[in-house]
């Protein structure tokens, strides 16, 4: 394979779409804390001065949607009108109904093992051994850049930083291996009182250099720091935000295929979310076991049916055993029925708000990032 470039992006917790994702998942967590069997599909829209929370929720719990919304926006850092959005004064509107009984009858079963999928759909999981967290490097470092922006903003060391930010990293690959970083883009919202010179220098020294490994940077690496020259108006004042609009940022940065379903605001009965987590778990364990250097898995479901309608493995020529054998191993060691994967990954807990910014994958404390099946897979494969 010749040299090639590959790029991924990320956005900070203060990006409008990510504000929406975090509010949706904060509502989900608050409900799951009281009612683990709740059915939640919570969508959020944010724009200057307002938040609209809607969706279908069936639960025995009562939660204060307005308080959850304000607390989430406050924790992100939008706490005064100078930023264009203020947790204390924005309007919070609610338009929530109940889940359709037609859907519910296909999901709930007397035998929980026969719990049907909450919808049809296809999901992908992916892993690669090019980073220590078995994730593609471009999206991993794009996340780390905006996470670092948040850290230095919240610590007060760069007091002119504001919550909205975006990053993009272009890696150079040679014969499929990382050869360096070709380009870095970092745009951050800021207050009026910082010069572009000071901003460029501080972003370079306090955000970019501490995050990106020096051995991948060279004299030819290109840096684009706030390339428009000004980013004062940001957050919901600059753009409206919606739940589920950053599905590539949430997953693999474009390095793997995507089934199209978003994650945030959905309880684990929605296979858009839970089966995508399970697919990541499967792919990561296959790579951790040394059965392939790269692994992508597709699973699909029919609404109301427990068993997946298909399982497909792709290893891009890096497999140590055949893809047919890998598929048999997946069926043997992983229960990909909705109830089975919920139990396998212990998903009925309020763990979701934290997933809603900086990526759902590659963060080791989430249960779908465990590699506890790797040794069994390796032994069963005869390696």
Curated annotation (Swiss-Prot):
Pathway: Amino-acid biosynthesis; S-adenosyl-L-methionine biosynthesis; S-adenosyl-L-methionine from L-methionine: step 1/1. Binds 2 divalent ions per subunit. Binds 1 potassium ion per subunit. This is S-adenosylmethionine synthase. GO terms for biological process: one-carbon metabolic process; S-adenosylmethionine biosynthetic process. Homotetramer; dimer of dimers. Its EC number is 2.5.1.6. Keywords: ATP-binding, Cytoplasm, Magnesium, Metal-binding, Nucleotide-binding, One-carbon metabolism, Potassium, Transferase. Gene3D superfamilies: 3.30.300.10. Belongs to the AdoMet synthase family. Mg(2+) binds at residue 17. It comes from Pectobacterium atrosepticum (strain SCRI 1043 / ATCC BAA-672). The gene is metK. It is found in: Cytoplasm. ATP binds at residues 15, 164-166, 230-231, 239, 245-246, 262, 266. It is an enzyme of class 2 (transferase).
């Amino acid at each position: 394979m010749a040299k090639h470039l590959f790029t991924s992006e990320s956005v900070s917790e203060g990006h409008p779409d990510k504000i929406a994702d975090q509010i949706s998942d904060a509502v989900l967590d608050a409900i799951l804390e009281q009612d683990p069997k709740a059915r939640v599909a919570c969508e959020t829209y944010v724009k200057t001065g307002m938040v609209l929370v809607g969706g279908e929720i069936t639960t025995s719990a009562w939660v204060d949607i307005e308080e959850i919304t304000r607390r989430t926006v406050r924790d992100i850092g939008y706490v005064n009108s100078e930023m264009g959005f203020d947790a204390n004064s924005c309007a919070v509107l609610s338009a929530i109904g109940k889940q359709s009984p037609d859907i519910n009858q296909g999901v709930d079963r007397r035998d929980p093992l026969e719990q049907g999928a909450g919808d049809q759909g296809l999901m992908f999981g992916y892993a690669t051994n090019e980073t220590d967290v078995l994730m593609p490097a471009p999206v991993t470092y794009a996340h780390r850049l905006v996470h670092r922006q948040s850290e230095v903003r919240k610590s007060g060391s760069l007091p002119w930083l504001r919550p909205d930010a975006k990053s993009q990293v272009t890696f150079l690959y040679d014969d499929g291996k990382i050869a360096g970083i070709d380009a870095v883009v970092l745009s951050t919202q800021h207050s009026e009182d910082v010069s572009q010179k000071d901003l460029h220098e501080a972003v370079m020294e306090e955000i970019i250099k501490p995050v990106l490994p020096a051995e991948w940077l060279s004299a030819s690496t290109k840096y684009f720091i706030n390339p428009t020259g000004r980013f004062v108006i940001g957050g919901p004042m600059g753009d409206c935000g919606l739940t589920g609009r950053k599905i590539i940022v949430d997953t693999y940065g474009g390095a793997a295929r995507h089934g199209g379903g978003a994650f945030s605001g959905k309880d684990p009965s929605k296979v858009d979310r839970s089966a995508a987590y399970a697919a990541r778990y499967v792919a990561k364990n296959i790579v951790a076991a040394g059965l392939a250097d790269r692994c992508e898995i597709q699973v699909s479901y029919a609404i109301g049916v427990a068993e997946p309608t298909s399982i497909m493995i792709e290893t891009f020529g890096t497999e140590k055993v055949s893809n047919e054998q890998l598929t048999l191993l997946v069926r043997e060691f992983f229960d990909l029925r909705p109830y089975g994967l919920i139990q396998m990954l212990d998903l009925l807990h309020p763990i979701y708000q934290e997933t809603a910014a900086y990526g759902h994958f590659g963060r080791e404390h989430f249960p779908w990032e465990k590699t506890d099946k790797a040794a069994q897979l390796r032994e069963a494969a005869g390696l």
